[in-house]
Amino acid sequence: GYEVIDTIK
């Protein structure tokens, strides 16, 4: 998705 948003999800 974005930057850390992919990491959080």
UniProtKB/Swiss-Prot annotation:
One of its GO terms (molecular function) is metal ion binding. Keywords: Calcium, Heme, Hydrogen peroxide, Iron, Metal-binding, Oxidoreductase, Peroxidase, Secreted. The keyword Oxidoreductase applies. It is an enzyme of class 1 (oxidoreductase). Its EC number is 1.11.1.7. It catalyses: 2 a phenolic donor + H2O2 = 2 a phenolic radical donor + 2 H2O. Its cofactor is heme b; Ca(2+). GO terms for biological process: hydrogen peroxide catabolic process. GO terms for cellular component: extracellular region. It is found in: Secreted. Binds 1 heme b (iron(II)-protoporphyrin IX) group per subunit. Belongs to the peroxidase family. Classical plant (class III) peroxidase subfamily. Removal of H(2)O(2), oxidation of toxic reductants, biosynthesis and degradation of lignin, suberization, auxin catabolism, response to environmental stresses such as wounding, pathogen attack and oxidative stress. These functions might be dependent on each isozyme/isoform in each plant tissue. This is Peroxidase 6.
